[in-house]
Amino acid sequence: MCLLFNRVVDMENPERHTVYLVVSLFVTFLSNKNSTPTDEKANAKKQSLVFRHFNTLLGYSSTEKCFTIPPARLRKAAVCNAFISGLPEILDMNLHTGNQLLPTVAQLLIHLPSPQKLASDQNVTNYSLALLTQHTRHLWLQSLILILYKYRFDQLPVSEYIVRLIGIVVKTLQNQVHECSDAADQSAEIDTWDEIEDDDVARAELIRPESLTVTTIQEATPAAEGMVHIGAVCVMQPTIVEPEGLAPEPLIARKRSTAVQEVRRKKSAIEVVKKSCTLRCGHCNEAIEMFDEETISLCLIALETFLHREPSMAAPILFKILYTVTRLIDTPMYPWHSTEMFVPANSRSVAKQMLRVSLHHLSTSAICLQLFDTKIPRPDAFWSVVALSLADFPELSPVYFIQILMEDLEESWPGSVKLIMKNLAFYIVEIPTDMYNNPWKDLVGHLETFFKRYHSAISADNGITPTRAEIENVIIVMTHVFKVQTFSSSKSPVTLVEAFARWLSESLHSADVSLESLLGVCTACNRALIRERDKQCITRALVTELMQAIKFKVKLHESNYVTIANMILQDAGEDIEVPLLDDQFNTAASEAIRPFLFEVLDFIADLHVIAKLKKESNSDALGGDLKVKLAEAIAVEMSRSNARDCRTVIRFIPWLMSPPSVTQAAPSAFADSVTNVRVLSWLLLGALHANHSCLPVPIECSQHMADYIHFVLAGFADQSKQSVVHMSALFHAFHLCQLWTVYCERAATYSSTTAFAHLVDFWARVTPAILQLLSHSKVLADMVNLHFLNTIQALQQVNSALLCQLYSMWAPILTAYHSQIPNQLRMKLDSCQNQPSLEAPLVTEWLKKVRYKISQVELQTSAASPYYTV
């Protein structure tokens, strides 16, 4: 055998068939179990010598432990092809010989598909099997699978070789489902035809049948034979040779040599054309490679075998493997791949089986926790494929996969669950809620334990507070769990809801939550449970947290105050400024706030709450926005009764029915009246923000409203210097007049026929009090004139019908103290008279301005009250 190998030392031996047969005979010999040498040293020495000769023939240097022949040349060698053809049989049939050849075989498998040009070039680590022919690829993969299945590879240097081989397999699968890399050079340029050298064009010229010419053989110099000169370019013109009679033997040999050279030229031209016509990605300019289904299936089998044999070695590239497999499943090669049917020998079916078997095998090694705690590109597609693969796998159902995650979290709680919740939200929405009834029931208990642990983690002194995205993802998870058909029949659904509600209430302290998320989870809970009290568990927890926040016992995130208030108004059927894609929500929040309505009234009446909220949130608008939202909720509740009497007024604001008398007022009556005027202003603001049918204060109470304003105006001259609160009484009284006017006019438009008459009577009672206030002093008259002119301007902005009727009566008020209207007021009055509105007025814009003014006055009054006392 050694002598035979010595005869075959030329890699480009013309007798390639003979070389192939010789090596095939040697491979057949090695695959025979009886070829294993005995214990005799002589036979072992001879076999070692044979292997050394064969390694030399393959171009492998035993001293340098590397190949000295370029991969491209080795791929064409008959010796290599013959050896690769029988390599799987050797590895399968003769383990003793396979173990001896294993290091060399592993290096050969690494070197063979390499794209490096020279053997001395630096080894490339990121390449696929694209350079191998289809048949060679199959043999290559079969050999690798046998090594992974039958041989030990946990020791150096074989372990390093195996890792590199697995990298080649992974790269092959990645190239099959090409994905542009972020690190790819987007400015990569594709060579144009003008940049290709002329000699390359000549060698790459396509051979067409119509370009062939029939010539006779003539005596010619080899240099000129078959050459056509076109300018400076020498182009080879193929010829078909027809002999003329008999030719001498040297001429026949020369013809044979010419024919061989012609075939080589054609093959070289075809290879150049293939390289020039590579299919590339239009975005990143990387080559796009396509492989047959058997190659892909063999790659998947090799990866699964590797994961099963040595999971510790696969750990560094485990996610890359799983992600690539999911990309294969998500990218069908043929139309029938898109169906859910399991097709044997189908690469997509093999990939699904490989994915779920791998996850099941590694489920006891905390693979769930590691996978969910990994940043995944395109997580929606990834988790959709995982759920699809586990759908018909009894050993590991999609729901049981989540249960394993919960068990892993119970054993080892991570520093942050933000990424886990994000991936879990993408995964759980892919699981149907009408299947896997028993696994869903088992999961409820684990989720309860999870939220108890989660609540303890974020409520600790040094705990990591959840972000908005984290809260939103948890809400998505729980909303989907609530939609499970058998949720109410689980072992402890109520305790899970309570644990989640406590966590959600605590989370609202640190991050904002969207209104739609809160509406969705509260509605899902309302529909999932059976008992009425249990249905409102989450809603009641949110409303209670808001009530604790307005008492300043807890601190919510700035935007969550208004968000929870909007949730209450939405449930009451009111229009809110937040756009909602779906309005089919039922949270029962308007019912949950009913026990706290009197506490809400106290919050509205408190002069200092806006200043306190500003300190917590650094926002001037938060206090006013929250007050008007809660005032709207009270107004809606007060107007819910269909009775035309004043029973709701007596229940909520009984002091309105008994205004103080000017002659028999207590010392604190003026301060209380100013507070009541502010409360009435906020209630009317809330009612005007609500729908048209919202009338919390009956129109018949117009007389009592006028009596309160009359009392404040009558006592302002004497009480205004007592405190800062008293100083703002005039401002609040005139704004209440404006709001009551707009309130009555809207009622006259939509519901009440007597509203306008009551409004005229209201101003008939208030106007004398204004005239009486003008008689005190010039300074006070200027203040009253300014407020009264602001009232006229405000009524003009809302296009008040009352202004047209009473303006002639009001004009003398402006000159009651002065002989004529002062200049600073004249300009403002002229602007009102000379600029009539040509468009329909927007009452909402005016309400926003009034709301802002009232809140700013309360803020300034609260800030100045500690420093101004008499």
Swiss-Prot record:
> Where does it sit, as one GO cellular component term?
axon
Q: Which GO terms describe its biological process?
A: positive regulation of locomotion; response to anesthetic; response to ethanol; response to toluene; response to xenobiotic stimulus
Q: What is this protein called?
A: Uncoordinated protein 79
Q: Which organism is it from?
A: Caenorhabditis elegans
Upper taxonomic lineage: Eukaryota, Metazoa, Ecdysozoa, Nematoda, Chromadorea
